[in-house]
Amino acid sequence: MPVPEARSARRCGECHESYLTEWSGSAHAEADRSPVYRAMRAQAPDAAACDRCHAPLAAVIGRADPVTAEGVTCEVCHAIAEVTLGPHAASWTLQLAENRKYGPICDAVEPYFHRTGCSPLHAESPLCAACHHLEHVPAEGPAVPVFSEFAEWQHGETMPAGLHCQGCHMPQRRLAVASGGPIRDAVSEHGDGAATGDALRLTARALLGPEGLQISGHIEVSGAPHAVPVGLPGREILLGANLVSGTGEILSSAADIVYSRMLVDAHGEETPFFRALRVGSDTRLRPDEKRSFELWLPAAPPDAHVELRLLERALSPELALALAIELPAPRVLQVQRLTAPWGRAP
């Protein structure tokens, strides 16, 4: 039986240039080569199971074909003909043999290069559940949630009617789908879409108290139908504060508040999900939740200001150590500057 052919994203980009540009900078393009994934895969008991979502074409055409290193490439999502939801994971069917590309546009004219397939599924959340719905089932004990964003969307009470993953993560704009094609009013972006920082609202004030500056306020999730941070357990949102002098020198820092989900082993130590027995803690921010916080800094000189920073880190220090990789540098989501005159704490 002949092996189905898969085409590189670069070939698709000859007609779909804007899509190629957006996808090339996305997490989907990095799925098979991110340092965190490669370290996880090296320790996982079943590396082929990891490839199912990080290099899906490998299961169909074999790792020898270089196109598999493109991760979640064009040929993956647009060859999905069916997604089946299971209790612990979802499965999908890739249809490569006919060179038919599935998508939500149902009046497309077939070009010379490939056939087209009308697929309402491609505008709905179950498509994303193919990889964003996963529970680890240990040898003993209940299933451990790993990727739960689909389940949180599915069972959430804050989701606007009709909102699917694509509504935030693949926002629409006016564009020609292919070079020379008609301009359409609702064409989905193919980058990462909504970012973590877009879903978080931060309000704060600084008051002078007997122990120094009290930084207090609220952080809330706005518009997202799932908890934040999303994705791999061990991903962290960090909220911290620096006291900065008039010349820009950091005088002192408050310890970060960490929002994350941590999975643990039999000894209660944080561990990669494939060795986890249970959830050790879950301090993620819930949809439409408004959570208060408090940080303290020493009393400030007259010309100093407070820099409140909201960061995202791909992995906790404990998991980085367990995986023997360098701790990823945090990404800045938001920065707020609080300045004198300070109010008085009650």
Where are these regions (language model features)?
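Short, conserved sequence motifs used for protein processing/export or organelle targeting and
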Residues: G62, H136, Q154-P346
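Sequence context of c-type cytochrome heme-c attachment sites
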Residues: M1-A123, L127-M159
